[in-house]
Amino acid sequence: MSKRASSKYKIDRRMGENIWGRPKSPVNRREYGPGQHGQRRKGKLSDFGVQLRAKQKLKGYYGDLREKQFRATYDEANRRKGDTSENLIGLLESRLDAIVYRAKFVPTVFAARQFVNHGHVSVNGVKVNIGSYRCKAGDVIEVRQKSKQLAIVLEATQLAERDVPDYIEVDHNKMVATFVRVPTLSDVPYAVIMEPQLVVEFYSR
């Protein structure tokens, strides 16, 4: 397991929230952050602090994206017509690794990135090994034949803690998903409140 993958629980502790809604999250048992200073009482955040926290939470949710990559996604959302915050969510949910996670092909978004990177997924019949690959409405995402019996896949499809959202159609018998449409914020089944408008405010300072 990579260091970035093993850090997933640290993200929960850092945020003080169970951001993926997982039963084993350590924040279900403790109310302070990671590290030796985690138990210190937290003061009231400034406006900047609130905006930064919203950004860090959204970055963390999608696999602790690197700042350069997340900023590039925001910049594209800002260039597009319409509401920048909604555009940002749509772009993040259009990532191949996000769709693999939403389709319940794997148990976590970290596993989804590794699964894609290791060549286990195809889009419209072509192998794609880039987690940030942007899917379009109508794209068909499939677990490649040689990977369909992997234990991680079989276990993930049985997870009861989350459902497949209605903007993705899935056949778990064939391990095929269709990205029906780009979702809006209200469509996305976040386990906690996400505030992309605060992310827009952060980058607009």
UniProtKB/Swiss-Prot annotation:
GO terms for biological process: ribosomal small subunit biogenesis; translation. Gene3D superfamilies: Ribosomal Protein S4 Delta 41, Chain A, domain 1, RNA-binding S4 domain. Residues 1-46 are annotated as: Disordered. Pfam families: Ribosomal_S4, S4. The keyword rRNA-binding applies. Belongs to the universal ribosomal protein uS4 family. One of the primary rRNA binding proteins, it binds directly to 16S rRNA where it nucleates assembly of the body of the 30S subunit. This is Small ribosomal subunit protein uS4. It comes from Allorhizobium ampelinum (strain ATCC BAA-846 / DSM 112012 / S4).
